Amino acid sequence: MVVDKNNHQIISEKNLIKDISAINYDQSINVVIEIPLGDDQKWEVSKFDGNLKHEFFMGKPRLINYSPYPVNYGIIPSTVSSIELGGDGDPLDVVFLGKKRDRGDIIKAKPIGVLKMRDFGDKDDKIIAVPNTEKFLTINSLEDLNNKDLEELEKIKSWFQNYKGTNIVEFIGYGNKLEAEKIINTSINHYNKYGIKFF
């Protein structure tokens, strides 16, 4: 990847949406990291060219006006949260637990659940995923995670519920691993059938 500081973007050899599969042969998912743990810069993968770009607001690079991200944040490539099904038309969001990763990293992960939210009325599901490393080998569900660290999910939920301000993002509830897998498969099928719309 090439960092283009003048244009506030990271240029990838691959289109980070179209050229990477959502699911691997071992049923792990691929996650593209947009915002590392502890970061306050709002970046996203562009739907137009698949490169990572710093979002702009009122002519300036966007920063989160809240505490930094409590978790690595990114997308599952080759997916879309369908507008027709109440989503926002973007690739499926992922919160990725574990150590801090670099922006643009592509990581194999295992989904263990879903954080269900609404953002300005749009469905804004966020898949909860963990790495398949020694620390997380026994974490295969939200129950496993709670048994290991009861505060982790609450910390993540509270952050996403409040970082945009009061009464903007609504927490709907949690979904288990099977529900997360169903959401992922639906988003893959919709992407394969319709692709991503640019508006």
Where do the PLM segments sit?
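Hydrophobic N-terminal alpha-helices or hydrophobic patches in metabolic proteins across all domains
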Residues: 1-199
